[in-house]
């Protein structure tokens, strides 16, 4: 039988020193590099995980990395919709967004959720600034039509949901240069000023590509990508992903997450990971330790 570790021993100065020593080569390797984090799931709704996330982001910035946060907010949007008597519906993992829902999305993501994240990071010593797609023309978009498997000639209209047409990273780079931590809401804007709801995983993937990020980390509510038996898949190739799409192993909200991760890997992001946001300090574990957590996505 294995003895239960003594908590005092685990938190001893020697253990802490060993952890710092393990992190040093990673700090050196990733110094000055951009790390894009898709922040969502339980990590956004449980206080201990919120604080863990904020501390991780601030520490990464303090040791010389450049974290960029792209946040979701699905549960918060659902709560706001319920208060006005609406229920959210989804097609292929994308939220159907009529005009009234779009107003709620803008208010929740660009206001309440974003400001909560900014304040949380600032309270633990960071300097965070909130952005939406409108700021500096950051995220330009057009209406998205979903593929209709039953009738390919008639795509599915899901309302004010957008496809990204262009990302202008200048405002993000300027904030990074001035030691700020950008916090980006996944709202894009069309040429006529129309606001579009864009899946946060898609925004995170595209932001990582355009910024030339070293790493893209997608936080989720599972240990990573699981096979049909519930076993964690430590790494996924492009071919394996196609197979998992085809047999339905990857479905629902995981579809845009994996598709965006694979696109990022194919377009120059050196390392893409699906990480378990329920694990405290999952960002530090993935970036600054030998072990890491979750599933690595490869374009090969």
UniProtKB/Swiss-Prot annotation:
Key word Cell membrane present: no
Keywords: Amino-acid biosynthesis, Arginine biosynthesis, ATP-binding, Cytoplasm, Kinase, Nucleotide-binding, Transferase
MF-aspect GO terms: acetylglutamate kinase activity; ATP binding
Domain of life: Bacteria
InterPro entries: AceGlu_kinase-like_sf (IPR036393), AcgluKinase_fam (IPR004662), ArgB (IPR037528), Asp/Glu/Uridylate_kinase (IPR001048), Glu/AcGlu_kinase (IPR001057), NAGK-C (IPR041727)
Record-listed E.C. numbers: 2.7.2.8
Single Gene Ontology BP annotation: L-arginine biosynthetic process
Pfam families for the chain: AA_kinase
Localization per record: Cytoplasm
Recorded GO CC terms: cytoplasm
Enzymatic class: transferase
Pathway: Amino-acid biosynthesis; L-arginine biosynthesis; N(2)-acetyl-L-ornithine from L-glutamate: step 2/4
Residues bound to substrate: 73-74, 95, 197
UniProt keyword rRNA-binding, yes or no: no
Catalytic activity: N-acetyl-L-glutamate + ATP = N-acetyl-L-glutamyl 5-phosphate + ADP
Sites annotated Transition state stabilizer: 38, 257
Similarity remark: Belongs to the acetylglutamate kinase family. ArgB subfamily.
Record function comment: Catalyzes the ATP-dependent phosphorylation of N-acetyl-L-glutamate.
NCBIfam families registered for this protein in UniProt: argB
Designated name of the protein: Acetylglutamate kinase
